[in-house]
Design a protein with these regions (language model features):
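A conserved beta-strand->alpha-helix junction
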Residues: 1-36, 40
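Intrinsically disordered or highly flexible coil/loop and linker segments, enriched in small
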Residues: 4, 51-54, 144
Length: 202
């Protein structure tokens, strides 16, 4: 059984700027500030370069796993809670379906182009047909429990994490990749712009 290594990467601003044209080309036709922040995080992470316990490290793994789909299937976005507040679980169900329907055009193409630029293949476990079918068969209240304050999003996943002994992780609030990696702050203009604003001309 293989162990897991936490590879910590630190991308200097100058390096970010030097790769910006490449990232924009790969993510096009997506061109929003949010898309750029996500694409940049995926681009640098998929290089597999960084440090493990302070020692330089580069992975030779060719297959990457992506968590794409978990938010769309299990109500992980803030707008899902907003939909629930507006119209209860019926409104939430419609919002989840809308997000799931647009994954191919909004996310998959962008992510696949960016990740494959480093000669790696990506797998999407949450988008496996059986996983999607199973989650779609469940009542939405089993997937999201917004009566809880911060931890009602992705409720089913949090329950599973707790069952597997990942109690600490199960209690953490969600952080989007662009905020968890700080990629949203790499571009001075983008840091103060709305995520839906256009970052560049596609």
């Amino acid at each position: 059984m293989h162990g897991f290594r936490l590879v910590q990467g630190n991308v200097p601003y100058a390096e970010y700027v030097s790769c910006l044209d490449t990232v924009q080309m790969l993510m096009s036709p997506q061109a929003s500030v949010m898309d750029l922040s996500i694409a940049a995080a995926l681009f640098f992470a998929s290089r597999g370069e960084g440090y493990v316990d302070g020692v330089p490290y580069k992975t030779d793994a060719r297959i990457l796993l992506s968590g794409l789909g978990a938010d769309e299937l299990l109500a992980g976005y803030a707008r899902h809670r907003q939909a629930w507040r507006r119209g209860g679980y019926d409104a939430l169900t419609k919002e989840l379906q809308l997000d799931l329907d647009r994954i191919p055009t909004r996310n998959l193409g962008r992510d696949d182009r960016v990740l494959s630029s480093h000669n790696r293949e990506v797998r999407y476990p949450y988008l496996a047909r059986k996983v999607v079918a199973y989650l779609a068969s469940l009542p939405v209240q089993a997937k999201a429990y917004f009566e809880l304050d911060e931890l009602g999003d992705k409720y089913l996943l949090r329950c599973l994490a707790t069952h597997l002994g990942l109690t600490y992780a199960a209690q953490l609030p969600k952080r989007a990749i662009q905020f968890g990696t700080r990629s949203a702050k790499m571009d001075a203009a983008g840091a103060h712009a709305k995520g839906t604003a256009q970052a560049f001309a596609p």
